Protein backbone atom coordinates (compact mmCIF):
# COMPACT_ATOMS: atom_id res chain seq x y z
CA UNK A 1 0.00 0.00 0.00
CA UNK A 2 1.21 3.48 -0.84
CA UNK A 3 0.58 6.34 1.53
CA UNK A 4 0.53 9.85 0.09
CA UNK A 5 -0.16 13.04 1.99
CA UNK A 6 -0.11 16.73 1.13
CA UNK A 7 -0.61 20.13 2.71
CA UNK A 8 -2.60 22.30 0.29
CA UNK A 9 -3.48 26.00 0.49
CA UNK A 10 -6.43 27.52 -1.34
CA UNK A 11 -10.21 27.70 -1.32
CA UNK A 12 -11.96 24.77 0.35
CA UNK A 13 -15.39 25.75 -1.00
CA UNK A 14 -14.29 25.57 -4.66
CA UNK A 15 -11.63 22.89 -4.23
CA UNK A 16 -9.00 25.01 -5.97
CA UNK A 17 -5.58 24.88 -4.30
CA UNK A 18 -2.71 27.03 -5.52
CA UNK A 19 0.10 25.72 -3.31
CA UNK A 20 0.89 22.09 -2.49
CA UNK A 21 3.57 20.73 -0.15
CA UNK A 22 4.54 17.10 0.46
CA UNK A 23 3.64 16.15 4.01
CA UNK A 24 6.10 14.07 6.03
CA UNK A 25 4.42 14.06 9.46
CA UNK A 26 1.19 15.35 11.00
CA UNK A 27 -0.19 15.56 14.55
CA UNK A 28 -3.74 16.66 15.36
CA UNK A 29 -4.22 17.77 18.98
CA UNK A 30 -7.74 17.57 20.40
CA UNK A 31 -8.85 18.88 23.75
CA UNK A 32 -11.84 19.71 25.89
CA UNK A 33 -11.91 21.35 29.27
CA UNK A 34 -13.00 19.20 32.17
CA UNK A 35 -14.18 19.87 35.69
CA UNK A 36 -14.63 17.26 38.42
CA UNK A 37 -13.48 14.48 36.05
CA UNK A 38 -16.16 15.29 33.44
CA UNK A 39 -15.89 17.26 30.22
CA UNK A 40 -17.67 20.61 30.48
CA UNK A 41 -16.96 22.05 27.02
CA UNK A 42 -17.23 20.90 23.43
CA UNK A 43 -14.25 19.16 21.89
CA UNK A 44 -11.95 21.32 19.77
CA UNK A 45 -8.91 20.74 17.65
CA UNK A 46 -6.40 22.72 19.65
CA UNK A 47 -3.62 22.71 17.05
CA UNK A 48 -2.25 20.97 13.99
CA UNK A 49 1.46 20.26 13.73
CA UNK A 50 2.86 19.35 10.32
CA UNK A 51 6.27 18.60 8.86
CA UNK A 52 6.65 19.21 5.13
CA UNK A 53 9.49 18.78 2.70
CA UNK A 54 11.05 22.21 2.30
CA UNK A 55 10.32 23.69 -1.13
CA UNK A 56 12.89 25.32 -3.37
CA UNK A 57 14.73 28.42 -2.19
CA UNK A 58 12.43 30.75 -4.17
CA UNK A 59 9.24 29.55 -2.41
CA UNK A 60 9.00 31.68 0.74
CA UNK A 61 5.23 31.39 1.19
CA UNK A 62 5.37 29.38 4.42
CA UNK A 63 7.88 31.75 6.04
CA UNK A 64 5.81 34.77 4.97
CA UNK A 65 2.66 33.19 6.40
CA UNK A 66 4.40 32.82 9.74
CA UNK A 67 6.02 36.28 9.73
CA UNK A 68 2.97 38.25 8.51
CA UNK A 69 0.46 36.57 10.88
CA UNK A 70 -2.05 36.22 8.03
CA UNK A 71 -4.92 33.74 7.94
CA UNK A 72 -4.97 30.95 5.37
CA UNK A 73 -7.42 28.26 4.32
CA UNK A 74 -6.54 24.86 3.01
CA UNK A 75 -6.40 21.20 3.81
CA UNK A 76 -4.28 18.23 4.73
CA UNK A 77 -5.12 15.21 2.62
CA UNK A 78 -4.13 11.62 3.34
CA UNK A 79 -4.47 9.01 0.56
CA UNK A 80 -4.01 5.33 1.30
CA UNK A 81 -3.88 3.58 -2.05
CA UNK A 82 -3.94 -0.16 -2.58
CA UNK A 83 -1.77 -1.58 -5.35
CA UNK A 84 -4.24 -4.41 -5.98
CA UNK A 85 -7.37 -2.30 -6.47
CA UNK A 86 -8.37 1.16 -7.58
CA UNK A 87 -9.94 1.94 -4.19
CA UNK A 88 -8.52 4.89 -2.30
CA UNK A 89 -9.18 5.46 1.37
CA UNK A 90 -8.96 9.19 2.01
CA UNK A 91 -8.91 11.29 5.15
CA UNK A 92 -9.40 15.02 4.78
CA UNK A 93 -8.55 17.74 7.31
CA UNK A 94 -9.78 21.16 6.14
CA UNK A 95 -8.93 24.37 7.97
CA UNK A 96 -10.35 27.90 7.78
CA UNK A 97 -8.90 31.07 9.29
CA UNK A 98 -5.63 29.35 10.16
CA UNK A 99 -2.52 31.06 11.50
CA UNK A 100 0.97 29.65 11.74
CA UNK A 101 2.29 30.37 15.23
CA UNK A 102 5.47 28.29 15.16
CA UNK A 103 7.96 27.69 12.36
CA UNK A 104 11.11 25.55 12.43
CA UNK A 105 13.57 24.62 9.73
CA UNK A 106 15.23 21.22 10.15
CA UNK A 107 18.27 19.72 8.46
CA UNK A 108 18.93 15.97 8.47
CA UNK A 109 22.33 14.82 7.29
CA UNK A 110 21.87 11.06 6.85
CA UNK A 111 18.67 10.80 4.82
CA UNK A 112 17.82 11.43 1.18
CA UNK A 113 15.55 14.44 1.69
CA UNK A 114 17.43 16.59 4.12
CA UNK A 115 15.50 19.80 4.65
CA UNK A 116 12.11 20.08 6.33
CA UNK A 117 9.79 22.73 7.74
CA UNK A 118 7.86 22.08 10.95
CA UNK A 119 4.74 24.26 11.36
CA UNK A 120 2.29 24.61 14.22
CA UNK A 121 -1.12 25.85 13.13
CA UNK A 122 -4.18 27.06 15.00
CA UNK A 123 -7.43 27.59 13.10
CA UNK A 124 -10.85 29.06 13.77
CA UNK A 125 -12.47 26.00 12.19
CA UNK A 126 -11.12 22.55 11.40
CA UNK A 127 -13.22 19.91 9.66
CA UNK A 128 -12.07 16.30 9.68
CA UNK A 129 -14.01 14.41 7.04
CA UNK A 130 -17.51 15.58 8.08
CA UNK A 131 -16.86 16.50 11.73
CA UNK A 132 -16.32 20.23 12.42
CA UNK A 133 -14.39 21.66 15.36
CA UNK A 134 -14.50 25.37 16.18
CA UNK A 135 -11.71 26.94 18.18
CA UNK A 136 -13.05 30.10 19.79
CA UNK A 137 -9.60 31.03 21.06
CA UNK A 138 -8.27 31.27 17.51
CA UNK A 139 -10.72 33.94 16.34
CA UNK A 140 -10.10 37.66 16.66
CA UNK A 141 -13.35 38.14 18.60
CA UNK A 142 -12.21 36.00 21.56
Language-model segments: residues:
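Glycine-rich, low-complexity intrinsically disordered segments
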Residues: 1-142
Amino acid sequence: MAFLSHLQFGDNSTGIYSRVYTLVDCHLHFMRHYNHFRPDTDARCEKVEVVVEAPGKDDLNLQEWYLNNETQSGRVIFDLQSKTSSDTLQKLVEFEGARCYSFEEEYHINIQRRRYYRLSIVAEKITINDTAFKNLYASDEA
